[in-house]
UniProtKB/Swiss-Prot annotation:
It comes from Odorrana hainanensis. InterPro entries: Frog_antimicrobial_propeptide, Frog_antimicrobial_Ranidae. Belongs to the frog skin active peptide (FSAP) family. Brevinin subfamily. Residues 23-41 form a propeptide. GO terms for cellular component: extracellular region. It is found in: Secreted. Keywords: Amphibian defense peptide, Cleavage on pair of basic residues, Secreted, Signal. It holds the Pfam family Antimicrobial23. Expressed by the skin glands. It comes from the Eukaryota. Disulfide bonds: none annotated. This is Odorranain-B1. Residues 1-22 form the signal peptide.
Amino acid sequence: MFTTKKPLLLLFFLGIISLSVCEQERDADEEDGGEVTEEEVKRAALKGCWTKSIPPKPCFGKR
């Protein structure tokens, strides 16, 4: 029982950190008027680039 609690606690902790970072980025984005920079566009393109194959393969530059 204790061995399953550690990974779950770690996942919960990492999820909370991730949500906090997203909230900070969202707040910062609202402060600067919601303008999208070129870097954010590139980052979003790379995030959505993974296919559902097993193992996942990146599609660098291909859409």
